[in-house]
């Protein structure tokens, strides 16, 4: 199963989670300019940049001759909103049709019931590992961006990142993935980064806010975090899990003003509660540290955005971007 790259901090970890649960997932390493050029052959150039990047990655891989097309599938997340995140699947299928590769199935991972996928099931062990992996990815991203601009010993933060990434992968690929061990690792990870010797200087902090793929994928934002660090600033990037909370939180407005069934909001709010419970060890560890701050609450982000833009402004991550800017 081929998966386009979106966030290097998270997707290597998530690949291990999928592979432990009986799938052979490969996160594509071809997130580069060539992938964009390939994407332009199959997606009209008035489609957004992320869709060119993703379709390009998929088609570049399938056309490479490396994979047996009769034993290969493509996986893509689908949010169910009005934006390209719902239309990727159609973009990819159209590109496959144009090149005579219609036998390659495109798997949609969605919670909105947009598509069902025979042969692909989100099981409890897989969901558990993916959730833990996403939290670990967020911690690593926070810690690396916060500490790297100030490190006394050059390269120590990146080395620490690689060590912890391997520890996380070993944990997620083990036979027993316990919540107590997850909590312990959250605290240990934050503590180890917190203890890295840093210079006492104060640099400008620059928030990176934008569409999800452009925000998290260095190849899509011209390696913005590295550029900011080279120019003497500290990059701050919001959590990936916040986006999932945003998708859940939107159901409240839809039920109140757009005639959606009330139980949708109830289920979504339970989803937010579950995510906050899952993130609790991370936020506790961050709150106890010297250099890090806990993650924002999605309801607080919505309140911050409300004086500027309505929570009904949801397509293209509408009010969420404003909330992140304010936060």
Features from the language model and the residues they span:
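An N-terminal assembly and electron-transfer interface module characteristic of large anaerobic redox
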Residues: 1-327
